[in-house]
């Protein structure tokens, strides 16, 4: 057990030489303390200590600042008396399981208790000055705040097991609540009354009565949640269930999707003729009545309504279909015995359709459920390898063979649909809304059924106001209606934000009319004079809106006075000029899940100003960067789920590559945001007549400086020469300085040094002063680091030794013992803020440097590391450090955490992923 008096005997007293408070003086200095004029301890900093228990008695009553962060063995902190002057309490990253804050902490402003494994936190009295509380990443089951927390603004409680959190209505200054990844089932409605609230994180909870579209769609869900909570604050509120979802029929043309839709609605309905094929999309409601309590978990029987979205299977409409797919849907993939390439030239395999459904996550982060339906069973069967399908697509929940002409056989399908409802979403039967909100939805449905295709936002507001919705509720409900597909709203589009579409079929029909229109040229030029012919039953104002809608969907782009529609380009590839008869290199982007139909067409729209000499066709385009006179050919191989890129640049820098990659990533992000689709692609390079993954190419570039793909890793930029500088005084310096040292000037050993240097320099931009020496000799280490705050060393290493260059014209290098390195650093007569040793097995050296008092922090490695691991760590670490240059420990932890989440992170020789928190180790000065 330790007490304050015992601790200060071994610590350094910080002296106040000016108008700086004791708290500010000690803050940031470990193993130190400060006294007031009466000789009482006012500030104490002993982070990363070996304390097990700390008891604070009367000798601590003057404490204003207490820092014990990172004391991993500290299990107990006992306050024997109130600490009325304490303002800051840092107890994060310790081993405290429970803690009690007694009465009398009236000055306490900030409390940090994250990452302790804390199971109980008790405030026995008021904390009227408390502004911030961080209890993230613990094991707390509940939090309760009474009227003594009126100043509290920021609560961080992510990653606990919170089942309940209660607030007092007097807490009117709340601004930020981070409550993600808990087990909350409800939230106090009165929060909507707090005018200062701005941020609310709720992802990963269990608020099953509130639609996840409200609280789990955005990282900060306050805007929509505020409106919902406002609706609950009203007197005599009636909550009603919204038992509704989409059923989306997908598959190739002529497999019987429309027949299935008709038979679900009426088992006796006649089958449609071939001429009645669905043009793009049809939508009809399908209600299942009298679902039992056993099926729903509700106290009484209820009905459930599917809106059946019947997608036409014709290839030309696939680009439209994705506009209307969504999560919280049940997918029916329909095939048949004659659904093969032999019968249908536009046939695509089940992999495309199931990958499309698989890309849409449902509310729990799981993939949307799919029923695999083989139709026309009376006419023949096609063998299905169910095990293979399930292995590729785990969201296929059931397989069924039916015939639409055999009533008895068909009835098995609706029974299977009922069983699948609960798989759509965990809250599918529990979500409730204010009856006023659902009343608005009913009003909109009635308008649609009466033939109204759209209304103005002003009309929508009037309908909501008449139903009693407030301004916050109106904003939230419109967002939700758009997300669940009840309306289409382009709130971010200046020309469409006052327009709300009630009938998606009307939009679909308008787009289909463009697709079906016979243009007079191969470029599919949509001239203004064509619009009255294409949309003859639409008014002029409607045509203007629809044209803007096509632009918003990246369906067309403007060229002079006309609009170009890439989806309608000819299949014929144009002839290239002589200077494009060959290209320098080829890259493939392989989409991990699937390549959405129309991706290349949207890509052309976004980069249309770079299209070269009208070299554009249905499956490809040639781009030019005018400033550098460089070229890129981009083509789509849809069935391979791949985009192919060929580049041409005499200088080998290929500036178009970054723009192409960035644009395709932006298109992915748009779908991730609007549709919650999980889209990513892997990069491959064609090297020595083989396709190689990008990480493998990066290693090859390290070995071969002439590799044509070095531009992908920033290796084509000129190297900034190291300039020896005189020692720079630290006081008053605006920026921290970094010196990058390596010992491989001829790049003879693949340690990733040049890439590290380039990545670090690009990452930090002008946030730090950056210097480098790429041929550091063993006896120049000290002189190179004079006046530098951060020293980054990238060399080869073995335990207790690093290797620095001896002669840059040979392979010779000198082994430098840890003790010698320490002596070199001692010459600077300066304690560094940080030394980073990116070398194999460098932890021993890092520890010796810290133990020698030469730096406050040092980072080393525990094993042999690959160049990829070294590069990734360096880039991520400095990217985070530039925003928090004084929080080195936290930045290190966050770096390791984020890298461990990367599914493309480096692998060990045995194929296992790196655990960066074990491979890299940080040491901190403690004496």
Swiss-Prot record:
Pfam short name (any one): COR-A
A biological-process GO annotation: proteolysis
UniProt entry keywords in alphabetical sequence: Antiviral defense, Hydrolase, Leucine-rich repeat, Protease, Repeat, Serine protease
Active site: 796, 840
Domain of life: Bacteria
Ranges where the COR domain occurs: 436-623
Start-end of each LRR repeat: 38-61, 83-107, 109-125, 127-151, 171-194, 195-217
EC number from the UniProt entry: 3.4.21.-
pH dependency: Optimum pH is 8.4 to 10.2.
Impact noted for substituting residue 840 to A: Protease-bGSDM pair no longer toxic in E.coli, protease does not cleave bGSDM, liposomes incubated with bGSDM do not leak
GO molecular function terms noted in the UniProt entry: serine-type peptidase activity
SUPFAM superfamilies given in the database record: L domain-like, P-loop containing nucleoside triphosphate hydrolases
Region (LRR 5): 152-170
Gene3D superfamilies recorded: 3.30.310.200, P-loop containing nucleotide triphosphate hydrolases (3.40.50.300), Ribonuclease Inhibitor (3.80.10.10), Winged helix-like DNA-binding domain superfamily/Winged helix DNA-binding domain (1.10.10.10)
Function in brief: A dedicated protease for gasdermin bGSDM; cleaves the bGSDM precursor, releasing the pore-forming moiety, which integrates into the membrane and triggers cell death. Probably involved in defense against bacteriophages. Expression of bGSDM and this neighboring protease is highly toxic in E.coli. Cells expressing the gene pair stop dividing and lose membrane integrity. Both proteins are required to kill E.coli.
Protein name, entry field: Roc-COR-CHAT protease
Source organism: Runella zeae (strain ATCC BAA-293 / DSM 19591 / LMG 21438 / NS12)
